[in-house]
Every structure is written in structure tokens, then in C-alpha cells.
Swiss-Prot record:
InterPro entries for this protein: Ntn_hydrolases_N, Pept_T1A_Psome_bsu_arc, Pept_T1A_subB, Proteasome_sua/b, Proteasome_suB-type
Taxonomic path: Archaea, Methanobacteriati, Methanobacteriota, Stenosarchaea group, Halobacteria
Name the UniProt record assigns to this protein: Proteasome subunit beta
Reaction equation(s) it catalyzes: Cleavage of peptide bonds with very broad specificity
Transmembrane segments: none
Amino acid sequence: MRTPTGDLSDGPAEELGRDQPVFGPEIGEFEHSERRAAQADGEGEMKTGTTTVGIKTADGVVMATDMRASLGGMVSSKDVQKVEEVHPRGALTIAGSVSAAQNLISTLKAETSLYETRRGKDMSMEALSTLTGNLLRSGAFYIVQPILGGVDDEGSHIYSIDALGGTTEEEYTVTGSGSQYALGVLEQEYDDDVTVDEAKTMAAKAIQSAVERDLASGNGINVAVVTDDGVDITRYKDFDDLL
């Protein structure tokens, strides 16, 4: 999770005017020249990170994240929930700007509720992934990289969605600064017959691997299990509870 400090002059802020950066209020307004200087000076950049994981199984999906928020070299929070329910049978992990992620989650919740009210049924995961990609592509949430997971009439789904709205359905996926460590665990242990309980253990191992090597990840794990029965999110401070 992070707060934005990079140059926004080539994105939506350019269309609104240089004096009104889209995400400025979260950290204070920066003049254009100051943003340029911060970008040019490596020491001026705020390094941030997280680790999020999504795993598909035959009976549902498992999504897991660490619980640390960082800002530069500082741990800004030790108890952050980075996975949220956005659909009666769907959840979203978040990596990126805090404000943009919160706004994206609120928008998705509102859209899925409106869809259900108008049509009398839940939005499919394919439609929800398209909606999420379109919102990111619009530019308003372009510093967020989520994982979307859920269950619908077609089965279980995990979608990797990049910051520009590109959407790919995967068997498993990871995001964040610790992703290279987590991905190695999933590559080694995943198989098509994995159960929900096995996926929970696998996700915990993946997050733990990232926490041991990535300074921006840590402080426990949030695990979301999504099945036909709904979304269940549980916090664990100790990895041993899952291993």
C-alpha cells in the first residue's frame, strides 16, 4: 500500500491542470517543479510495498495479503486490511495508493449492488473483471494493482488486473513488492486439484516467504475464502495458525 509521490503530469492530472494533481490532497499539493525534482532524486522517492496472492480451486478461491503499510523507510501501519468483499461472492486485494484503492472498492461495491437491484441477480465475475479493468483504464484509479477473485455460475475465477486495466484470468497470481518470493512458492506447490484448505496453507507459505525477504511486507496475514456461501475474511497474526 502506498501514497502517491510520483510525477502525475502525463496522466489525468495533465487534463485537469498542473496545479490540481488528482491525488494531491492525500499528501499535500506539490508544484510541478517539486514533483519533477522528487522523481529525479532517488532519495526523494517514497518506496512502498505489499504482497498479495490469489489462488483458484474447484470449490472457490483463496486470497491472502500481508498487513503492513509502508511509506519510505517507515512502517506506517501494522494492521491494514488489503482484501475486501466487493460482491456477494467476490473479493478484491489491493496494492498501491490507499486513497485510490479505497475509492475503487467503494465504486465496485456500489456498482455490483446497483446491478443486482436492476437485474435481480448477481453480476458475473467476467463482467466484474471487465468493470474493474474499465475503471482502472479511465485513469481515476491508475495507481492500484488489484487481484479479483470470486465464484459465479461458471465456477471459480481469479483475475490479475494491471494498473492500466489489462485483465487476465489465472490459476494463481501475485502482486506487490514481495511478489517474486510469493510466486516461487506458488509455482512449486500449485496443482489443478488443490482444495480450499490446501490453498489457504499455500497462500500462507507464499506470504510468509515474502515477509521473510521483503521489508515492505509483514505483520501478519489476511485470508479471504470465497465460495458459493459468500466471502469470509480472517486475520491471522501468526502464520503457524495456517501452516
